[in-house]
Amino acid sequence: MLRVAVPNKGALSEPATEILAEAGYRRRTDPKDLTVVDPVNRVEFFFLRPKDIAIYVGSGDLDFGITGRDLVHDSDASVCERLALGFGSSSFRYAGPAGRDWTTSDLAGKRIATAYSNLVRKDLVAKGIEATVIRLDGAVEISVQLGVADVIADVVGSGRTLSLHDLVAFGEPLCDSEAVLIERGDRGSLDHHETVAARDQLVARVQGVVFGQQYLMLDYDCPRSVLDKATLITSGLESPTIAPLAEPGWVAIRALVPRRDINGIMDELAAIGAKAILASDIRFCRF
C-alpha cells in the first residue's frame, strides 16, 4: 500500500486535502484523525506537520508527501519534486527594519532570526557572508522589535505581516515556493507491482486535477481565411480541433488554453474576426 503524507494544518492543509479529494481519494471525516486508509485506491494517508513531511519521505518511511518547496529545501532530505501543485505560492526572503536601503551585503555580522536555519545558512555560505543564524519556531517578525535579531529571513506572501512590524524585504528571494508533491529519492519500497501501480495512478490523477485548474477549454467560430492566425493563437496541447460550420467559409475551433492568458487570447481572437468565443472550466485533464 502506498504511504502518502498530507499537511495536517496551516495554509497548505485544506488545498492539499481538496486536491486529493478531487483526484478521487478518500477524505478524513475527523480533523483529529492522523491516518486515513483508502483500500480502493491502495493508499494510506498520514496527516503530519508540514515541516516534518520531507524528512519522513526522505527517510523512506513514506513514499510521497505534499508540502512547501521552501520546507523541502530547508530539510536537506533526500527527496525528488514530482509535481508543482499551483497553490501556496510565496517567496522566502530577508527583511530588515524599514527606513534603510538594505542589501544582502548588510547581513555581514548581523543576527538573523528564522525558522528555516538550514536554508539561510546555505544561502550565506553561497554568498560568502558570515552572520549569526538564530533559529526560532515561529513569529520571527517580532524578534527584531524585541532585540533578539537584527534582521529576519521568512516566508513572504503579500508582505502585510512585514509591514505590520515595520519591516521591509530586500535582496533576491532565497527560494520561490509553492506546494509540491515530493517522492523519496530511493524508490526501494516501490518494487512491488501494486505499489508501483498506485504510485503512477496517484501522480496521474493529481496531475490531471492540477492541469484542470490551470487550463480552460476555448471554443469559437472564425472565418476560414484567418484559420492560420487563429491556430497560432490557440495551438492547443497537440493541435486544435477544427470542424466546418454550416455557414460557408467558417469553421469551429476548440483548444485548451492557459487560464492565466485567457483574456489576452480572447482579445486576439476577436481582433482577427472570431465570433462566439466561449471559455469553459474543466475539472480534469489527462495528457
UniProtKB/Swiss-Prot annotation:
It is found in: Cytoplasm. SUPFAM superfamilies: GlnB-like, Periplasmic binding protein-like II. Gene3D superfamilies: 3.30.70.120, Periplasmic binding protein-like II. Its main location: cytoplasm. Keywords: Amino-acid biosynthesis, ATP-binding, Cytoplasm, Glycosyltransferase, Histidine biosynthesis, Magnesium, Metal-binding, Nucleotide-binding, Transferase. Belongs to the ATP phosphoribosyltransferase family. Long subfamily. This is ATP phosphoribosyltransferase. GO terms for molecular function: ATP binding; ATP phosphoribosyltransferase activity; magnesium ion binding. It catalyses: 1-(5-phospho-beta-D-ribosyl)-ATP + diphosphate = 5-phospho-alpha-D-ribose 1-diphosphate + ATP. Equilibrium between an active dimeric form, an inactive hexameric form and higher aggregates. Interconversion between the various forms is largely reversible and is influenced by the natural substrates and inhibitors of the enzyme. InterPro entries: ATP-PRT_HisG_long, ATP_PRibTrfase_cat, ATP_PRibTrfase_CS, ATP_PRibTrfase_HisG, HisG_C, N-reg_PII-like_a/b, N-reg_PII/ATP_PRibTrfase_C. It comes from Mycobacterium leprae (strain TN). It is an enzyme of class 2 (transferase). The lineage of its organism: Bacteria, Bacillati, Actinomycetota, Actinomycetes, Mycobacteriales. The keyword Nucleotide-binding applies.
